[in-house]
Amino acid sequence: MNRVTIRVPATTANLGPGFDAFGCALGLYTDVTFEETDSGLEITGCDEAYRGPDNMAYTAYCAVLASLSEEIRGVKIHIDAHIPICRGLGSSTALLVAGAMGANVLRGNKLSTQGLLNITNAMEGHPDNLAPAFYGGLTASMVEGGLPVTVSFPLHPDWQFLALVPDFNLSTPLARSVLPEQISRADAIYNIAHGALVLKALELGDEPLLRTAMQDRLHQNYRRKLIQDYDAIAALARTNGAAFCLSGAGPTLLCITRSKKLREVLTEKLPGVTRRSWEILPLHVEFQGAHVLESC
């Protein structure tokens, strides 16, 4: 085998109070093909600025080969990305995961999924996105002793996820720069309690509980100021029964509901509360994590 295509799902991190811990895989994908050659690097399917050796798929590919003490020969990489870039849906994570898994498959799957998670977490440091991208479904992660630890949680089958993707991006460094260096004990307790109930509400399909539990005091109140019309959109979603949160660091906004009518309501009423353009993406939870799409 010298050619493999890896499919990686989009991910949404935090889910309100689960800051840097919770993540969920969603049904939107990036496919990356790796074909070994004798020498050189060729990357297609992305902007010219991302076709060099600092491409995240390539750096993860090389990191896995280095961990296996394997020679890094030439490679052709083709990226077919359907995850919006810099929108809080794990576009960078998808490239890292694809690169790591692609290298591992081409070398006979010598590393476990946990091993790949360890390597990519050392590169990015965000297991809240990496874990659901590798494992699928809903996960909670922590880092202990420098290594990520992940647990999967059940989800009620009736949840509908609507991602509201704006016509502007927001970099993660900027979104982190507005966060306070210290928090109060009361805010820490608030998020711990709400986070625990988010997981239970998602399991039970309890929409009123999820709507309340998805409140947070650690990041969303600071980041909302970077997103035009955040408050108006949040009020619209919650008034119509949905739980609401930032997707990752934003600017994508996430509505979670059991109602099949919310998309229609948002399509009709969203233009009345914002002058920006927002694409409404209905997404299902993807329970299959990164995997081989085809190989030869």
What kind of feature is each model-predicted range?
Residues 71-149:
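Gly/Ser-rich oxyanion-binding loop with an adjacent helix/lid
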Residues 12-14, 23-26, 69-70, 88, ...:
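Solvent-exposed alpha-helices and their adjacent loops that cap or buttress functional pockets
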Residues 28, 137, 165-170, 217-218, ...:
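Glycine-rich beta-alpha junction loops
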Residues 1-87, 101, 105, 109-111, ...:
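ATP-binding N-lobe of GHMP and related small-molecule kinases
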Residues 202-296:
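Glycine-rich, charge-dense phosphate/pyrophosphate-binding loop(s)
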Residues 35, 133-135, 139-144, 255-258, ...:
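Short beta-strand-to-turn element immediately C-terminal to the catalytic PLP-Schiff-base lysine
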Residues 158-240:
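Acyltransferase
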Residues 7-9, 25, 133-136, 142, ...:
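Short beta-strand segments
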